[in-house]
Structure formats: structure tokens, C-alpha cells
Regions:
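His/Asp/Glu-rich metal-coordinating catalytic cores
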Residues: 3-4, 8-162, 176-187
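Conserved two-lobed SF2 helicase motor
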Residues: 168-171
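Active-site lining segments that contact anionic ligands and/or coordinate catalytic metals
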Residues: 164-166
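Calmodulin-binding IQ motif helices
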Residues: 190
Length: 190
């Protein structure tokens, strides 16, 4: 039949909205295959910069195939750093004296941290809704990715007791999914 083939994996740190994202290089007898997964180049990322030196070294060694995925790769220019999002939140929060509702991917712990930090700065409580958002919040806090000041988080069931100008709701449903937390929020007119 065929002969055995030894494959050795090498993991390379990349930036993405998900913490600890990696690309990997598979060394085979016929050449190296690099799979990036979705990534962006962010020089100020919370979890460290993409390992361009390691990717460059692989390129110098020779790569048989590069399997690359990067959202908006066809657009010219650069993808802004996740840190720029906090500035956008600050601008929006500073001009708002009503309840703020924000949707985001539940898996983006860095964005959730930005929201929590800015909400605290503006004296607002944060309630999260959506099962995946609640799960990510719990796990990311346990793993140390999220630093949540005491007294900042409130249970979604307690939001009617908080003045609108002191509340931020972070919800799943940023892509308009039926039955997402955002969709359900819209049905009860909170």
C-alpha cells in the first residue's frame, strides 16, 4: 500500500477576535503546508502580536502550500486594531444619556473587555444576555482574559432596577439571527 508518513505540527501565534488563535505549519516529506485560519495583523493586540518572524522564517525555508483565510483580505488598507474600538465606544458612551445596547460575537472576549472597561469609566453597569455570551464571559474570566471590576456586572433580570443612563446591555445577535438574544430583547421592548 503506502508508506508511513511522519507529520510534525508547529503552532504560530496569530491575531483574531478569539484569544490564543494559532496558525499551524505541517512539515511533511514533500514540503511544508501552512494553515492560518482567519487572522489579522494587529500590532497592539491584547494577547500579543502575530508571530511574523516565525511566519517569515517558514517562508524562507519554503512553503509548499499556504491555506490562508482573512476576512476582508480583498480590501485595500489595514484592519484597525481592536484597541481602536474602545475609542469608538467612548465617543458613543460620552454622548448618550439613555440605555446602551451593543451586539457582538460572543467569542470576542477582547471586545467584551473593551465594553466592560468603557462602561465602568462612564459609571455604567453591564448586563450580558445570550447563552453563548454568558458562557464566554464565565470561561474568559476563569482563564484570566477578562478583568471585571467588582460591582460592574449585573444579572439581566435586574436591569429594570437600574436607570437607563447607567446601563449597558451586551447581547449576542450581531448578525440578525432569529431567536438570538437581541431578537428576543426586541420582542419585549426593553
Amino acid at each position: 500500500m503506502g508508506s508511513e508518513m511522519c507529520i510534525r505540527d508547529r503552532f504560530i501565534h496569530v491575531n483574531h477576535s478569539i484569544a490564543d488563535a494559532v496558525a499551524f505549519a505541517i512539515k511533511t516529506p514533500v514540503g511544508t503546508v501552512v494553515m492560518t485560519g482567519d487572522f489579522k495583523i494587529d500590532t497592539t493586540a491584547e494577547d500579543g502580536m502575530i508571530d511574523l518572524a516565525r511566519l517569515g522564517a517558514l517562508g524562507k525555508e519554503g512553503v509548499l502550500a499556504l491555506l490562508c483565510d482573512s476576512t476582508n483580505v480583498e480590501r485595500q488598507g489595514y484592519t484597525p486594531s481592536e484597541r481602536t474600538v474602545a475609542g469608538s465606544f467612548e465617543r458613543q458612551f460620552s454622548g448618550c444619556n439613555k440605555r446602551i445596547i451593543v451586539t457582538t460575537f460572543a467569542s470576542n472576549a477582547f471586545r467584551l473587555q473593551s465594553l466592560i472597561t468603557v462602561a465602568k469609566k462612564f459609571g455604567r453597569k453591564v448586563a450580558v444576555t445570550g447563552r453563548s455570551m454568558e458562557n464566554i464571559l464565565k470561561v474568559s474570566t476563569e482563564l484570566g482574559y477578562l478583568k471585571i471590576p467588582a460591582g460592574t456586572l449585573v444579572d439581566i433580570n435586574q436591569i429594570k432596577q437600574i436607570p437607563n443612563n447607567k446601563l449597558v446591555i451586551v447581547s449576542t445577535g450581531s448578525q440578525g439571527e432569529n431567536m438570538s438574544a437581541l431578537y428576543r430583547l426586541s420582542l419585549i421592548h426593553i
